[in-house]
Amino acid sequence: MFHILSIVNIIWLLLALCFGAAFCLNKFSVKLPNRVEHVFQDFIRYGKTKENIKRASWQLVFDLSKRYFYHFYVVSVMWNGLLLLFSIRSVVMSEAFPDWIIDVLGSLTGRSRGAWNEIHLSTLLLQVLLWVHTLRRLLECLFVSVFSDGVINVVQYAFGLSYYIILGLTVLCTNDSLPQSESVSFFNQLTWYHVVGTLLFFWASFLQHQSLSLLAKMRTDSSGKVETLAHKMPCGGWFELVSCPHYLAELLIYAAMCVCCGCASLTWWMVVLYVLCNQALAAQLCHEYYRSKFKTYPHHRKAFIPFVL
């Protein structure tokens, strides 16, 4: 019971509930007092979805360029690369984690220091996949995506910076919920769900990259030179099914990582639930934007999940 109510699980559950509540409240926010609605909409929207909402002049002071998204991935590549290095040294050299990391993990999970004496193959695999994912996203932000003049607010920026720090620690927190295998050598822990999860991860990553590339191509010519920063109606690939296949791919990436730990970690299920709520909200706002901007927008196209949402 204490493990279920650990701080790390509560953090992700609360985040999921907050974004899930925001998703539901968005449909009825017009009934809120004007000042409350304006603040609410400002906090849940970013980029193009902020364009047509009413915002007080004081709110504009807290705007930052959406181009700063790459900062999140710089932090992640460095931080999660460091945690990955500690794990590799633990597996290869039987070197203990630094005391400060063990103390943080113990506070998040309520477990003793011994929970990280042995790093499970699933945990190390999750760390590798997370690092690969954020490295790819960093490279896409720098060399593929063409950002408009859209903005995010400073609270969203601060959340984005801290998100991957917490996520990296969360991956290590999953280690204590996985079955320990002292009698089985590290690489003999390899099983079918590691293979299936990794294959799903790379397929979802390809889907996300393809979708982001299609969005970028709508603003560039055949030589790759930027022609416009205007928002156009997306088409091609999975855009024929949903408005935001890159958000769907994000969910699939986290689901694939859940498969990699045999779907046995309650903590990672909480993360997947958060990603579902977060990406569903972002996708719904984009979907509403496209439908309001383009009169010929396909009626059959869903926001996030084909034929469902």
From Swiss-Prot:
<dbReference type="GO" id="GO:0102389">
    <property type="term" value="F:polyprenol reductase activity"/>
</dbReference>
<dbReference type="GO" id="GO:0047751">
    <property type="term" value="F:3-oxo-5-alpha-steroid 4-dehydrogenase (NADP+) activity"/>
</dbReference>
<dbReference type="GO" id="GO:0019348">
    <property type="term" value="P:dolichol metabolic process"/>
</dbReference>
<feature type="topological domain" description="Lumenal">
    <location>
        <begin position="136"/>
        <end position="150"/>
    </location>
</feature>
<dbReference type="GO" id="GO:0016628">
    <property type="term" value="F:oxidoreductase activity, acting on the CH-CH group of donors, NAD or NADP as acceptor"/>
</dbReference>
<dbReference type="GO" id="GO:0160198">
    <property type="term" value="F:polyprenal reductase activity"/>
</dbReference>
<feature type="transmembrane region" description="Helical">
    <location>
        <begin position="186"/>
        <end position="206"/>
    </location>
</feature>
<feature type="transmembrane region" description="Helical">
    <location>
        <begin position="256"/>
        <end position="276"/>
    </location>
</feature>
<dbReference type="GO" id="GO:0019408">
    <property type="term" value="P:dolichol biosynthetic process"/>
</dbReference>
<keyword id="KW-0560">Oxidoreductase</keyword>
<protein>
    <recommendedName>
        <fullName>Polyprenal reductase</fullName>
        <ecNumber>1.3.1.94</ecNumber>
        <ecNumber>1.3.1.22</ecNumber>
    </recommendedName>
</protein>
<dbReference type="GO" id="GO:0005789">
    <property type="term" value="C:endoplasmic reticulum membrane"/>
</dbReference>
<comment type="pathway">
    <text>Protein modification; protein glycosylation.</text>
</comment>
<keyword id="KW-0256">Endoplasmic reticulum</keyword>
<feature type="transmembrane region" description="Helical">
    <location>
        <begin position="151"/>
        <end position="171"/>
    </location>
</feature>
<keyword id="KW-1133">Transmembrane helix</keyword>
<feature type="topological domain" description="Lumenal">
    <location>
        <begin position="25"/>
        <end position="67"/>
    </location>
</feature>
<keyword id="KW-0521">NADP</keyword>
<feature type="transmembrane region" description="Helical">
    <location>
        <begin position="115"/>
        <end position="135"/>
    </location>
</feature>
<comment type="similarity">
    <text>Belongs to the steroid 5-alpha reductase family. Polyprenal reductase subfamily.</text>
</comment>
<feature type="topological domain" description="Cytoplasmic">
    <location>
        <begin position="89"/>
        <end position="114"/>
    </location>
</feature>
<dbReference type="GO" id="GO:0005783">
    <property type="term" value="C:endoplasmic reticulum"/>
</dbReference>
<comment type="function">
    <text>Plays a key role in early steps of protein N-linked glycosylation by being involved in the conversion of polyprenol into dolichol. Acts as a polyprenal reductase that mediates the reduction of polyprenal into dolichal in a NADP-dependent mechanism. Dolichols are required for the synthesis of dolichol-linked monosaccharides and the oligosaccharide precursor used for N-glycosylation. Also able to convert testosterone (T) into 5-alpha-dihydrotestosterone (DHT).</text>
</comment>
<feature type="transmembrane region" description="Helical">
    <location>
        <begin position="68"/>
        <end position="88"/>
    </location>
</feature>
<dbReference type="InterPro" id="IPR039698">
    <property type="entry name" value="Dfg10/SRD5A3"/>
</dbReference>
<dbReference type="GO" id="GO:0016095">
    <property type="term" value="P:polyprenol catabolic process"/>
</dbReference>
<feature type="topological domain" description="Cytoplasmic">
    <location>
        <begin position="1"/>
        <end position="3"/>
    </location>
</feature>
<keyword id="KW-0443">Lipid metabolism</keyword>
<keyword id="KW-0812">Transmembrane</keyword>
<dbReference type="GO" id="GO:0006488">
    <property type="term" value="P:dolichol-linked oligosaccharide biosynthetic process"/>
</dbReference>
<feature type="topological domain" description="Lumenal">
    <location>
        <begin position="207"/>
        <end position="255"/>
    </location>
</feature>
<dbReference type="Pfam" id="PF02544">
    <property type="entry name" value="Steroid_dh"/>
</dbReference>
<feature type="transmembrane region" description="Helical">
    <location>
        <begin position="4"/>
        <end position="24"/>
    </location>
</feature>
<feature type="topological domain" description="Cytoplasmic">
    <location>
        <begin position="172"/>
        <end position="185"/>
    </location>
</feature>
<dbReference type="InterPro" id="IPR001104">
    <property type="entry name" value="3-oxo-5_a-steroid_4-DH_C"/>
</dbReference>
<feature type="topological domain" description="Cytoplasmic">
    <location>
        <begin position="277"/>
        <end position="309"/>
    </location>
</feature>
<keyword id="KW-0472">Membrane</keyword>
